[in-house]
Amino acid sequence: MSDLEYKIRPMTLDDYDEVYALWMQIHGFGIRSIDDSKEGVERFLKRNPTTSMVAVSEGKIVGAILCGHDGRRGCLYHVCVHENYRKHGIGKSMAVACMRALQEEKINKVCLIAFKSNELGNHFWKEAGWDFREDLNYYDFTLNEANICLLYTSPSPRDLSTS
């Protein structure tokens, strides 16, 4: 830790341009045009108005976490700290602020996804006491008309067992 001064506060839509610029500076960051657009983040923040956080130092945003929940489980997205501001406790402080906000909303379990290639991030979460789950497979499904039609027309497991 150092004597770097920073403040953790809830993210607002007014922070979007600065947060997006920060995301663009992070090597290997996965950004999606729809979900991470200003409109996508606005939807997310409206649904989760108190749980996402930014870190501000010297008048600029140097860290951010999108954090939300579905009423049952919380999830962290796009956890990042500007490269020049790492190793000052900013990531931990933002994560703790998110966890406290989730607790206020009666959420008691949180998940996150980290790219396997994100060695620094994976080390951070392991050191912070998060459990790596080897018993799960993670699946993604993009909601677009072609995929939904494919799902609808693909055989169900019951159909496959009778052939």
Task: Please name every model-derived segment.
Residues 1-14, 146-154:
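Conserved N-terminal entry element of GNAT/NAT acetyltransferase domains
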Residues 10-78, 101, 133-134:
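Acetyl-CoA-dependent GNAT
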Residues 79-86, 114-115:
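A short, internal acetyl-CoA/4′-phosphopantetheine-binding micro-motif in the GNAT/acyltransferase core
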Residues 87-100:
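Conserved acetyl-CoA-binding loop-helix of GNAT-fold acetyltransferases
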Residues 92-93, 116-135:
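Conserved active-site alpha-helix within GNAT-family acetyltransferase domains
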Residues 103-114:
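Conserved GNAT acetyl-CoA-binding A-motif
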Residues 152-163:
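Single conserved hydrophobic/aromatic residue that forms the stacking wall/gate
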